[in-house]
Structure formats: C-alpha cells, structure tokens
C-alpha cells in the first residue's frame, strides 16, 4: 500500500510540473515522471495480487517511453535551434 501512495505522490508532482512550468524540457521530464509513477503503481498492484501482468505492462510502458524520449527530444532540439528558447510557447513554430 505504501508504494501506491508513493506512486500517487510522484504522479501528482509530475502533473503539477506539467501544469506550472513553461520550459519544454522540464515539462517533458515531468511527463516521464508521471509515466514512472504509473509503472510503480502497475508493479505494486501486480505484487499485491500475485500476478506478473503489472510487471509486463510496466516493461512495455518503459519501451514506449524510450521511443517517446527520442522523438520528444528531437522536437525540443529543433525548436531550440530555431528560436534559441525551449519555451512551450514556441511550439507553435511547427505549424508552418
């Protein structure tokens, strides 16, 4: 039960970071923090119920998150090269 509370706290910290911060890299790190909190909850629930499904789901979420990191950082770097800023407000550059 303690791990589920910890996962909820970590998820809340990540959600607050996404809502409050304007820097794209910080927002990206907060989204990754939220994904890791979900992984912790999956593993904690799997441990409580004696199954392995939560661990398998957590593994697949980590694989997808690794691909997300590659694509997300490439987009952030392209915005930074164009504007010399990593602000979320500069993300509308990609529309043109």
UniProtKB/Swiss-Prot annotation:
UniProt record, GO biological process: ATP synthesis coupled electron transport
Q: Which reaction does it catalyse?
A: a quinone + NADH + 5 H(+)(in) = a quinol + NAD(+) + 4 H(+)(out)
UniProt GO molecular function: NADH:ubiquinone reductase (non-electrogenic) activity; quinone binding
Its top-level enzyme class, in one word, is translocase
Question: Matching Pfam families, A to Z?
Answer: Oxidored_q2
Q: Which GO terms describe its cellular component?
A: NADH dehydrogenase complex; plasma membrane
**InterPro entries, A to Z:** NADH_UbQ_OxRdtase_chain4L/K, NUOK/Mnh_C1-like
Function, as annotated? NDH-1 shuttles electrons from NADH, via FMN and iron-sulfur (Fe-S) centers, to quinones in the respiratory chain. The immediate electron acceptor for the enzyme in this species is believed to be a menaquinone. Couples the redox reaction to proton translocation (for every two electrons transferred, four hydrogen ions are translocated across the cytoplasmic membrane), and thus conserves the redox energy in a proton gradient.
What does the annotation say about its assembly with partners? NDH-1 is composed of 14 different subunits. Subunits NuoA, H, J, K, L, M, N constitute the membrane sector of the complex.
Q: What is this protein called?
A: NADH-quinone oxidoreductase subunit K
